[in-house]
Amino acid sequence: MKRFALALLTLGTLTGCGAPAFAAGAAPRGGAAPEEATRGGPLLADGRRILHVLHRLAFGSRPGDVERVRAVGLEAWIDRQLHPETIDDRATERALADLPSLRMSIPEALRQYPRPDPKLREKAQNGQLTRREMTEMSPPEKRPFRIVAELQAAKTLHAVESERQLQEIMVDFWFNHFNVFAGKGDVRWYVSAYERDVVRPNALGRFADLVRASARHPAMLFYLDNWLSARRDFTVPAGPNKGRKAGLNENYARELMELHTLGVDGGYTQSDVAEVARAFTGWSIDRPQTEGRFVFRPRMHDTGTKMVLGHSIPAGGGEDDGQRVLEVLIRQPSTARFIATKLVRRFVSDTPPPPLVDRVAATYLTSGGDIRTMLRVIFASPEFYGEDAYRAKVKTPFEFVASAVRALGATVDAHAAFDLARATAEIGEPLYQAQPPTGYPDRAEAWVSSGALLARMNFAQALASGRYPRVALDPGSLVAGADLRSPDAVLDRLLGALVAGQTSGETRAVLAAQLTSEEITRSGPDDRGPAKTDIAKLAALVLGSPEFQRR
C-alpha cells in the first residue's frame, strides 16, 4: 500500500506543470536568497546551483559530490567536464576491460560472435542434442547477443562510475539523435563500433563530424536500408539476387533531414527527399556478414544532376554527391534551430525557452556547429539557472537507475552493470533497443504512468535492499550518526542524503505516514532483533518520491 500511495503522489506531481514546490526551509545549507534574472524569473541560489548542475551535466550526485564541486568551484568543474580529456578516468577504463567486444573491429566481432548454426538449432529441436551439448557447442558468451549485452553494461558502468559525466550525458544524447536499432539484422555486430567510432569521439566536438561519420557507418547504412539503395534502373549483377531489379530507398534521406538535421518543420519537400536519396545511391556496405565496411558502389549510383533545397549538385559527382548534400544540410539555419532546440530541451526544459534557443542557434551558425561552444551558452544562461528549471525534467529509466545507484553511494563493476542494464530494460528502456529512428524520447509524458512508476519503486526496493549482490552499497553510511531507534531522524537523514532535504510538504507527509509500519520500524526489541529503522526500505521510498524522479 505504501508504494502505491507514493506512486499516486508521484504520478500526480510529475503530470503537473512546472518545477516542484519545496517545503519551507528545504533549501540546502549555504544557499542564498535568489537574485533576479536579467531574463525571465528568479535565479537559483548558489547551493541549489551545484545540485542543479549535477542533475543536468551528470547522472545525479554521489555522497560528497556537492562538497567536491564547491571546493573546486562550479565554473571550474563545468569547464573540466567540457574537456573530458583532462579528467583521469583510468579506473573506469580498467573496469571496462572485462568487456572484450567493446574493443573489436566489426570484422573481429563478426568472427568472434558468429551467427548461430541453424543445423545445431534443428538438432536441438529434434532432440539430437541436449541443452548442455548445445551450450557447449555454442556458449552464451560467444553468441551475437553478447555484443549488445556488453555494450549495455558498458553504458551503465560509464553512467555510474565515470568521472567524465558530461561526456556520458552527451554520448547518450547523440546516440538517441542518430539512433540505430541493435535488434535489426546485422546492426547487432556493428552497434558497438558505431558508438565507439562515431558517437563517443564527437560527442563534444563538431556537429558536422557526427553527421558525416554517421552517414558512412555500416550501422546507419544497414539500419535505414541505404546500403541497398540504387539508381532506379539498376539490376543486381551477381550473387543470389542476380538479375533482381533494385531501386531507390528514401529511408535514410528522409530521416537525415527530419531527425538528423533540418527537423520536421525544416522547410524541405518530398522532392528534396527523393533528390537526397539519389545523391546517396551507392553508399553501401562491403560484405556485410564478414567485413562490414563502408564501400561506394559506382554502378549503383545515380549520376544525374540533383537539386536539394535550391542547391544544384552537378552530374557525375559520384560519392561526393552525398558529401555535398551533407554540407548543404549542415549549414542550414533550420538545422541550427533544430539542434539548438533539442540541446535546450535536454538541459533546461521540456518546453525550451525561445530566447535561449535563438542564442544557441546563432552560436551554432557562428561557431560552425561546435557542440562545446553551444553548451557553454546554455550553461551560462539565466534560463538554465532559473528556479523554474530546477528539477523540471523527469528522469528516463536509464537516468533513474544510474542516479539511484550514485545517490546511494554504490559502486559497480562490469558484472554488476549487466544486472543494472537488465533492470533498466525491465522498467521501460532497453538500451540500444529503440526501434524507431527517433531514439528514446526526452519528454516527461513518454515516461510517466502509474505502472512505470511502480516498476521504478520495485527497482528501488530491490537495489536498496541488496538484491543486486554485485552492486556494492551500504545504506547505513547515508544515516551515519542518526539514532536508528528514531524513524523521524533516519528519514530526515535520508532526505538530506538523497534529495538534499528538498521535499514538498505533501511528500514529507506521505513518507512520514509510513514510519508507523512494522515493515519500516520496530519500536522495541523482538525476535527479529533490537529496535531499529529499516534503512533500506525507507531509502527505497525516498528514491520513489516525486523529487527523486526529477532532475
Feature annotation, model-predicted:
Residues A5-G16:
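Bacterial N-terminal signal peptides
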Residues G18-P20:
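Bacterial signal peptide processing site
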Residues A24-T38, P42-D46, L51-D65, P84, ...:
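Flexible, low-complexity segments enriched for small/polar residues
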Residues G41-R48, L57-G60, G64, R68-V72, ...:
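Soluble non-cytosolic domains of exported or imported proteins
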Residues N126, R131-E136, L151-K155, V187-T424, ...:
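Active-site substrate-binding loop specific to GH73 endo-beta-N-acetylglucosaminidase modules
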